[in-house]
Regions:
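Intrinsically disordered, low-complexity regulatory regions enriched in Ser/Pro/Gly/Thr
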Residues: 80, 105-112, 145
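Hydrophobic residues within the alpha-helices of tandem HEAT/HEAT-like
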Residues: 93-97, 120, 157
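Short helix-interrupting loop/turn segments at helix-coil junctions
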Residues: 82-84, 120-128, 162
């Protein structure tokens, strides 16, 4: 499929590095998205929000069989999207969730991720491909993909620009996600430990034994 030139870059963020599949980055994004899905599922009005989104083009009738991690691999492999472009796509999804009633669910996650990265490519990179090419990667008919793009533009309210400071802060969060998750996990275990006040609990969870004993003694 031949490529065509798109508009030049209109952002301060560098997306010029050679594209390749960044497994570390994609795994971190997968963890973030998985956490968001679980947190949304725990919402009291989750079923109500699911029902309110059923009529949207962004919502699929069935859960995709391909995992979101494999889907991310597929997207970066075929589009050759830069790492920073992938991150910008994630930031676009955050913006939409912040300024609309949309929440991430297993029924809209894949479509939102694909269209977000597609828009990030169009807005931040010099070269893009024809719609037919993107539709094949997404596994969505061309007409439907165009509808998804229009819906996405309306949801984000044409707010595609991302400043360098905002990007750097977001990227730093992704880079440190493992540390943040460890902190969250430790706080969860420490809370249980305080409730149980039981050394045996820590012995059964060796990862927290040393720190836990210090808290227990002091």
């Amino acid at each position: 499929m031949s490529s065509k030139s798109c508009q030049g870059k209109s952002t301060e963020i560098d997306t010029s590095e050679d594209a390749q599949i960044n497994e570390i980055l994609l795994n971190k994004i997968n963890k973030i998205l998985s956490i968001v899905l679980e947190e949304n599922k725990a919402l009291k009005n989750y079923k109500e929000k699911l029902s309110s989104q059923e009529s949207m083009t962004m919502t699929s009738y069935n859960k995709p069989s391909l995992s979101i991690l494999d889907y991310l691999y597929r997207i970066q492999s075929y589009t050759e999207a830069e790492d920073n472009t992938i991150i910008i796509g994630l930031m676009y999804i955050d913006r939409i969730c912040e300024q609309s009633s949309i929440i991430l669910t297993p029924y809209n996650l894949h479509r939102l991720v694909f269209v977000a990265i597609l828009m990030a490519i169009k807005y931040n990179e010099d070269v893009c491909f024809e719609f037919e090419f993107y539709a094949k990667i997404a596994g969505i008919p061309i007409k439907e993909l165009k509808m998804l793009e229009r819906e996405f533009v309306e949801l984000i309210k044409f707010h595609f620009y991302i400043g360098k400071d905002e990007f750097d802060k977001y990227k730093s969060y992704i880079d440190d996600i493992e540390i943040e998750l460890d902190k969250k996990e430790w706080l969860h275990f420490y809370k249980i430990f305080l409730e149980k006040n039981d050394i045996l609990f820590l012995l059964l969870n060796e990862k927290y034994l040393y720190i836990g004993i210090l808290f227990y003694l002091y």
